[in-house]
Amino acid sequence: MTAILERRESESLWGRFCNWITSTENRLYIGWFGVLMIPTLLTATSVFIIAFIAAPPVDIDGIREPVSGSLLYGNNIISGAIIPTSAAIGLHFYPIWEAASVDEWLYNGGPYELIVLHFLLGVACYMGREWELSFRLGMRPWIAVAYSAPVAAATAVFLIYPIGQGSFSDGMPLGISGTFNFMIVFQAEHNILMHPFHMLGVAGVFGSSLFSAMHGSLVTSSLIRETTENESANEGYRFGQEEETYNIVAAHGYFGRLIFQYASFNNSRSLHFFLAAWPVVGIWFTALGISTMAFNLNGFNFNQSVVDSQGRVINTWADIINRANLGMEVMHERNAHNFPLDLAAMEAPSVNG
């Protein structure tokens, strides 16, 4: 009888825990995805802060030339970064217990792999938590779908690209100048500016900025005034009010006359779907482009293929970009190799005389 009562009490505790985890009455919704999200993001954040402040230099290229990234080793907020895991480790799973000592783990850039893997797991769980909360509230799942765009982008640069290139040392450093270095090297090695998916991503980001500004300014300019001239128009809004807060007919008419009639939405729902879908699809394409270039399916490289009727080369901006890429690649990892791969693969010119 005692054993039966204890089991029932245990089940009751588990049931109360389940109800608390999945309750939508909590100030912050936890959910089953949150059970995994909270420890992974806390771990990633804690290790990032500690490593950014005090991590020793990392032998990123595997040639015994460690690179400093922390504040205590001479960097500032702009130049500091979490240096990626050493090329000597490659794609190996490298937890602390796989190293001979903590010093070795730090020297080989173990914190980077720890942070990145916990971060990716955490943001994926955050996306799942968004879906879970939407489901329990009876909402549609599009919030989680929209969030999948930055999750896909982060996964592309932190996981897919290193897998394609064969080493976590090719991942994006976790810092401001390190991010810029990653972008420059990526352009040099993959010609991303000439990749159609990157172009779609640029259209998504810049286009969504334009559309967001246009929508916000149109709504703000066509508010239904509920206050006097001496009060802010914003004071006329009550949270949860059933009435429209702005005149969509006026906004539609203004924009239709400014450009042309069918450039303006007359359906608020389709308008907001468009505002959400445009940047999400653009960033999806960018993430897909990074993932394809990870396996060296690179951007267009015309290689002086534009010629006139006589076969003479017509120089284009694409050729200028190619020359810039070679210059950037020469400067990249200059102590790890003598020549960029594009130059080293060519035959040596013949010398007469």
Swiss-Prot record:
Stabilizes free radical intermediate (site feature) positions: H190
Gene3D superfamilies hit by this protein: Photosystem II protein D1-like
CDD domains, alphabetized: Photosystem-II_D1 (cd09289)
PROSITE patterns reported in the protein's UniProt record: REACTION_CENTER
GTP-binding among keywords: no
Posttranslational modification: Tyr-161 forms a radical intermediate that is referred to as redox-active TyrZ, YZ or Y-Z. C-terminally processed by CTPA; processing is essential to allow assembly of the oxygen-evolving complex and thus photosynthetic growth.
InterPro entries in UniProt: D1/D2, Photo_II_D1/D2_sf, Photo_RC_L/M, Photo_RC_L/M_CS, PSII_D1
EC numbers for this chain: 1.10.3.9
Annotated membrane topology: Multi-pass membrane protein
Residues bearing the modification Phosphothreonine: T2
The record's free-text note on cofactor binding: The D1/D2 heterodimer binds P680, chlorophylls that are the primary electron donor of PSII, and subsequent electron acceptors. It shares a non-heme iron and each subunit binds pheophytin, quinone, additional chlorophylls, carotenoids and lipids. D1 provides most of the ligands for the Mn4-Ca-O5 cluster of the oxygen-evolving complex (OEC). There is also a Cl(-1) ion associated with D1 and D2, which is required for oxygen evolution. The PSII complex binds additional chlorophylls, carotenoids and specific lipids.
Positions with a binding annotation for chlorophyll a PD1: H198
Annotated TM spans: 29-46, 118-133, 142-156, 197-218, 274-288
Record family assignment: Belongs to the reaction center PufL/M/PsbA/D family.
Protein name: Photosystem II protein D1
Taxonomic classification: Eukaryota, Viridiplantae, Streptophyta, Embryophyta, Tracheophyta
